[in-house]
Amino acid sequence: MKWLIFGNKGWIGSMVSKILEQQGEQVVGAQSRADDESAVEREISEIKPDRVMSFIGRTHGPGYSTIDYLEQSGKLVENVKDNLYGPLCLAFICQKYNIHLTYLGTGCIFEGQNNFSADEKGFTENDKPNFFGSSYSVVKGFTDRLMHFFDNDVLNLRIRMPITIEQNPRSFITKILSYSRICSIPNSMTILDQMIPVMIDMARNKTTGTFNFTNPGLVSHNEILSLIRDIHKPNLTWENMSREQQLAILKADRSNNLLNTDKLQSLYPDVPDILTGIREVVSKMKFQQ
């Protein structure tokens, strides 16, 4: 099977490409920019892929490792181009050629109560975005809504706070380990080592529609750091700060929410819950002593 990957050189795209190649699949890295519809259509016509996957998007840039990059003056065009127009071009063109598209979107488009608990249902795939605290989330929220028009053609996966066993500046665990102060709030999160194989299986099976693509349940920053301290780094310390203190040092607010994973679990009941998954990840991580 031939897979055309947009964003194959990025963090997640390169991980997916590597796993596909290990599975014996033919992987082609897209040369066209997703926002150049003519070039995309030419490339798809020439490559004739069986599947297309999109890992494009703008979450950081020079001088910024977070979405605060998009709060700078003059970044609106880049935000809309990379986080809305490009993905929509791919959806329209793949629909035209009857090719299954997997789009890696985000669940950072909702805001729950700060004190929500694991016994709450969380936001479902049909809920409309209610978080507009950052330029990133505003644009991605409307992209998510538009992807619902492609329910029969596109697999729209909402990930959150992605985590990997291997430390990487993009991984949520690596990020919070670099912070001296933490605003610890329970959240839905996605463990990529456990979820990428599920993503590939869904694409291979031509599953379509929107899915909350997180490990079931909630985990807080403090719970993750406590596990790292207990297993690897007994001298690890950190300071907590309030949501108000966090807002004072950020250019934009951050989404905190619980995503309902019933739909995903109906197809993949063995996806590990987030607490079990985090314990497995932390136990396998390597740290310099």
Swiss-Prot record:
Pfam families: RmlD_sub_bind. GO terms for biological process: S-adenosylmethionine biosynthetic process. One of its GO terms (molecular function) is methionine adenosyltransferase regulator activity. InterPro entries: dTDP_dehydrorham_reduct, NAD(P)-bd_dom_sf, RmlD-like-bd. GO terms for cellular component: methionine adenosyltransferase complex. This is Uncharacterized protein L780. The lineage of its organism: Viruses, Varidnaviria, Bamfordvirae, Nucleocytoviricota, Megaviricetes.
